[in-house]
Amino acid sequence: MYPINSSEISPAELEARLRLHRLPELGPKRFRLLIDAFGCASKALSAPASAWRSLGLPAVSAEARRSHEVREGASAALAWLARPAQHLLMWDQREYPALLAQIDDAPPLLFVAGDPAILEKPQLAMVGSRRASRPGMDTAAAFSRSLASAGFVITSGLALGIDGAAHQAALEVGGQTIGVLGTGLEKFYPQRHRRLAAAMIAQGSAVVSEFPLDAAPQAGNFPRRNRIISGLSLGVLVVEAGIASGSLITARLAAEQGREVYAIPGSIHHPAAKGCHQLIRDGAVLVETIEHILEGLRGWQPLSRPVPLPATHPLVALLHAAPHTSEALAIASGRPLSQVLASLTELELEGQVICESGRWLARC
């Protein structure tokens, strides 16, 4: 999408911004410094190298302005924007997400595949381990379904593990979800989630990136994109994370940006719970049910309550008859244990069941 109000910026200025965006060692703050100093990207590109040096900008940035690679990349981006459902949001235009605009290093340009309007909707970020346990994945999916049903857009990084579970679960209940990439949109990573990303776009959600379309995976870009995940959101929920997890970076950034930080506790013997426990010690809200999140964010919009599972759920009926262990429920219901555990997690979130001393009971 060219800017919604096309009178705000000329085609020449748009191309100039895309060229500026591709220059090496030119991050968000330097990008805006150039626009402020010269008034527009077109004038910044034509300014003498000495003027760039006077602003403290590196020589490598100025020298690359007229390179073939920079020009070709900008032309390719213009062609990409001409296709359906492919958009560009700019930091100085009214369509840019208001919450994201508040952070110090908001990306000046944001490429969007899908529906850009959902970036303005109330969002809750969900992050966690790429190597999540099965219970961790089930917990992420259960919370995502409930939060999406309550009206939140679920925002995450489209990584393996918790991210993917959160995105997929939101789609399953007809919710919307945003994936923030650490690569360009044309260099999708991880490839295993390409189909998930396509489903998100097809179902009215979005995939976004601040990087040039052809930017390949680089280790340093993934922590950098985390500030966008937190910056778009009202709060960040960490589901399962070790003490060295990148999810803790997102949580730290969220706190610095004035966002809420939530963490789900786990077993003291589980290494992937130690990061969440550290966050709780540092002041994150300990979350056991969705109500712990909704209580703090209810004022942002008229949220509907999550749709509860019906009281006649087969597992609830079995538990009304007598308490059962998870394994006994699997045998009695004829369902796989993994499916039973996932259902029990959702039922517990809805307040219909409770686990005491290893046995599940139905709540009256």
Predicted regions and their residues:
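Short, small/acidic-rich helices and loops at N termini and domain boundaries
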Residues: 1-95, 326, 350-358, 362-364
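Glycine-biased, small-residue-rich flexible motifs in mid-sequence functional cores and linkers
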Residues: 2-13, 90-364
